[in-house]
């Protein structure tokens, strides 16, 4: 699946979910394209779906934070807290782009964000649908030779916060 033009992370995820539904996929795995994650760890994210009937497995970068740049650590922790305000989630790393999804998750998850807010929105949708979410510790490589996201951390954070506010407003509309 490839868009001719970069339409955003959420748009790419939306295309993947649509393709997975149309293909009747049993499991899909998402991995950010910035080179931070190790594809050889994909089996770690698939195993809980197959053996424990988990619906979503999130790669957890926070069990080993010593390598994470301080600005990322602060930003991710902040976004984790905001995401957990929208829906009760027992997840340490809500912003990880290394995940696996079961067939049930593929069918039930709904999201509208075309940008980076999709990661939070997907977990919020999963919680609303009572899907079982777990985490697996993963290895992260932060020095990827400039391949990491070029998005400004402040605009990235703002985009995610706006997406979460939309989800909170849908859950608790003004009367």
Where are these regions (language model features)?
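The conserved acidic donor/metal-binding loop of glycosyltransferases
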Residues: 32-36
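A generic structural signal for short, solvent-exposed coil/turn residues
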Residues: 1, 83, 130-132
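Acceptor/aglycone-binding surface of glycosyltransferases and processive sugar-polymer synthases
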Residues: 3-23, 27-29, 39-116, 142-159
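Hydrophobic helical membrane-anchoring modules
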Residues: 88, 112-175
């Amino acid at each position: 699946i490839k868009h001719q033009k970069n339409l955003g992370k959420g748009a790419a995820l939306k295309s993947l979910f649509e393709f997975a539904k149309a293909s009747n996929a049993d499991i899909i795995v998402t991995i950010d394209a910035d080179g931070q994650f190790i594809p050889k760890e994909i089996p770690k994210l698939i195993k809980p779906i197959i053996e424990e009937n988990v619906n979503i497995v999130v790669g957890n970068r926070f069990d080993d934070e010593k390598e994470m740049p301080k600005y990322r650590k602060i930003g991710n922790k902040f976004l984790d807290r905001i995401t957990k305000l929208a829906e009760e989630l027992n997840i340490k790393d809500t912003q990880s782009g290394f995940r696996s999804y079961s067939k049930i998750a593929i069918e039930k998850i709904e999201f509208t964000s075309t940008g980076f807010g999709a990661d939070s929105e997907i977990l919020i949708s999963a919680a609303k649908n009572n899907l079982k979410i777990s985490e697996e510790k993963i290895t992260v490589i932060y020095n990827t030779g400039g391949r990491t996201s070029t998005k400004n951390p402040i605009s990235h954070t703002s985009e995610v916060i706006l997406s979460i506010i939309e989800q909170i407003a849908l859950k608790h509309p003004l009367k």
